From Swiss-Prot:
The modification Phosphothreonine is found at residue 541. Specific subunit of the TRAPP (transport protein particle) II complex, a highly conserved vesicle tethering complex that functions in late Golgi trafficking as a membrane tether. TRAPPC14 is dispensable for TRAPPII complex integrity but mediates RAB3IP preciliary vesicle trafficking to the mother centriole during ciliogenesis. Modulates YAP1 activity as transcriptional regulator. The modification Phosphoserine is found at residues 491, 517, 546. It comes from the Eukaryota. This is Trafficking protein particle complex subunit 14. Residues 492-502 have a biased composition (Low complexity). GO terms for biological process: cilium assembly; regulation of cell population proliferation. Its main location: cytoplasm. It comes from Mus musculus (Mouse). Residues 95-134, 480-533 are annotated as: Disordered.
């Protein structure tokens, strides 16, 4: 019987007519425009048309199968169909667009596109939560039976296909619904198989109507998403670039969000069924909430945002949170992120919008424990005295003394500048005069805040930075570790001219009191001991004599302070001409 029917699948590009119109005019579907591609994540409605070959009522094969109108009507009313979808093409290889758009080593032009990283899609689904597993909640409609054909309105969702699937294989299975025999209802198949042979039990079902129809359609991927993360004055900013690169149709961006990926905080399930948390990964707590990333408003940040073919749009987000870590916060907290983009096209006849989830690079929250901020009135007039207020927030450790030193003459130290750049920098340095270049703030206890005002005067107009050349000098007491058991003590009775004793005394003096200064540009850990304007380390405590006979040892030479725990915030002032 299956060979006596023709099968056709119609994917309309417009909403289907009402069921009553299709039943009254079954051939109306032929005039509907068809689609030649689909979108990953959308819900597709289509028609499977089963048509009887020849005219109903004429003898087919000597009266077998569908020889009469009654036989066709009986078969058509007992048919059922179910659609499924699977990946129909070879998945892309390991090299993806996200790998090609990775950050180049050594950075690049801050305004160039090379600093944007490609973000791979994780999941794409339609309105509402994505269906999981093999279960489906899509509606099943009864077929429309006409004189010589049966129309099956079918629905299939494309949200379970892997990201990057190039083609979708849609398979429709058609079978004849039969009423179970009374003996099957009474005894069940297990009892019948135990008392009869399988061939005798299923002989009647071998002649039942069964057919399977499939087609292959092109899948268009979601919009391309790229990401760039940077920090400005201690604020974590993220720029998301959305690009319509695969569709020639216009798409609309309805919403875009950045959320913490709490699922990445868990390790795989242990054999006993327990689940462990990753220590340095943010989990569901008060550190980073679902609303921590806020989209900053802009002149072009309205929704919906239309994107034509090959058009892109940028969205700016900021991580909102306290600059100082909360009590009990972990150092170097890593926050896995995902981006959710809601988009649509006018060619989605049955889906209002599609949601695509992208994997973003993680953000590491290295909050500084010692922060220097500055504020002043702006603008100011030339030759007018103005005051800059510096605030030191100390959550690092106790310091014996804190000093602010205005040292613009060291700005060019260690830099290879051309003549034009040197003249421009020198002109900028000569434009600002500090009335009190040396300021002693005294003792700073951990958890305290120091505020100090410094007077300046501007000699030229322009925009000037007032934190870069204000060097921060911190004096602290270095902890002296206990000598290891295998260390051999040295006595003062040794010869004063001994090189070992002289080296020991110098290093012991340096361990009692140390000073470090920090400029606006923070070096990396590998340059911790670099001399110059960035950081200086020297002994400031006079030599302290050791009692005769008391053993001395050589303390380990290690970095006492880590530069990533100290930060300085920019402060700029605009200098204008006086009003005449």
């Amino acid at each position: 019987m299956e060979s006596q029917c023709d099968y056709s699948m119609y994917f309309p590009a417009v909403p289907l007519p009402p069921r009553a119109e299709l039943a009254g005019d079954p051939g109306r579907y032929r005039a509907l425009p068809r689609r030649n591609h689909l979108y990953l994540g959308e819900t597709v409605r289509f028609l499977l048309v089963l048509r009887c070959r020849g005219s109903v009522g004429a003898g087919v094969g000597g009266g077998a199968g569908l020889a009469s109108r009654g036989a066709w009507t009986e078969l058509a009313t007992s048919l059922a169909a179910l659609a499924s979808v699977s990946a129909g093409g070879a998945l892309p290889g390991c090299g993806s667009a996200g790998d090609q758009d990775a950050d180049p080593p050594g950075g690049g032009d801050p305004g160039g596109g090379g600093l944007f990283r490609g973000c791979s899609p994780l999941l794409t689904h339609g309105q509402g939560p994505a269906t999981s597993g093999g279960a489906t909640t899509l509606p099943v409609e009864e077929p429309i039976v006409s004189t010589d054909e049966v129309i099956f309105p079918l629905t299939v969702s494309l949200d379970r296909l892997p990201p990057g699937t190039p083609k979708a294989k849609i398979v429709v299975t058609v079978w004849k619904r039969e009423v179970e025999a009374p003996e099957v209802r009474d005894q069940g198949y297990l009892r019948l198989l135990q008392t009869r042979s399988p061939g005798e039990t299923f002989r009647g079902e071998q002649s039942a109507f069964k057919a399977q129809v499939s087609t292959l359609l092109t899948l268009l991927p979601p919009p391309v998403l790229k990401c760039r993360q940077f920090t400005v004055a201690g604020k974590h900013l993220t720029v998301l670039k959305v690009l319509n690169s695969s569709s020639q149709e216009e798409i609309s961006i309805w919403d875009i969000r950045i959320l913490p990926n709490f699922n990445a905080s868990y390790l795989p399930v242990m054999p006993d069924g327990s689940v462990l948390l990753v220590d340095n990964v943010c989990h569901q707590s008060g550190e980073v909430s679902m609303g921590s990333f806020c989209r900053l408003p802009g002149t072009s940040g309205y929704f919906p945002c239309p994107l034509s073919a090959l058009e892109e749009h940028n969205f700016l987000f900021q991580l909102r949170g306290g600059e100082q870590p909360p009590p009990g916060a972990k150092e170097g907290l890593e926050v896995p992120l995902i981006a959710v983009v809601q988009w649509s096209t006018p060619k989605l006849p049955f889906t209002q919008s599609i949601y695509t989830h992208y994997r973003l690079p993680s953000v590491r929250l290295d909050r500084p424990c010692f922060v220097m901020t500055a504020s002043c009135e702006s603008p100011v007039r030339t030759y007018e005295r103005f005051t800059v207020t510096y605030t030191l927030l100390n959550n690092l450790q106790d310091f014996l003394a804190v000093r602010l030193v205005w040292t613009p003459e060291h700005a060019q130290a260690g830099k290879q500048l051309c003549e034009e750049e040197r003249r421009a920098m020198q002109a900028a340095l000569d434009s600002i005069v500090c009335h009190t270049p040396l300021n002693n703030l005294g003792f700073s206890r951990k958890g305290s805040a120091l505020t100090f005002s410094v007077a300046f005067q501007a000699l030229r107009t322009g925009l000037f930075e007032l934190s870069q050349h204000m060097k921060l000098k911190l004096q602290f007491t270095a902890s002296v570790s206990h000598p290891p058991p295998e260390a051999r003590p040295l006595s003062r009775k040794s010869s004063p001219s001994s090189p070992a004793v002289r080296d020991l005394v110098e290093r012991h003096q340096a361990s009692l009191g140390r000073s470090q200064s920090f400029s606006h540009q923070q070096p990396s850990r590998s340059h911790l001991m670099r001399s110059g304007s960035v950081m200086e380390r020297r002994a400031i405590t006079p030599p302290v004599a050791s009692p005769v006979g008391r053993p001395l040892y050589l303390p380990p030479d290690k970095a006492v302070l880590s530069l990533d725990k100290i930060a300085k915030r920019e402060c700029k002032v605009l200098v204008v001409e006086p009003v005449k």
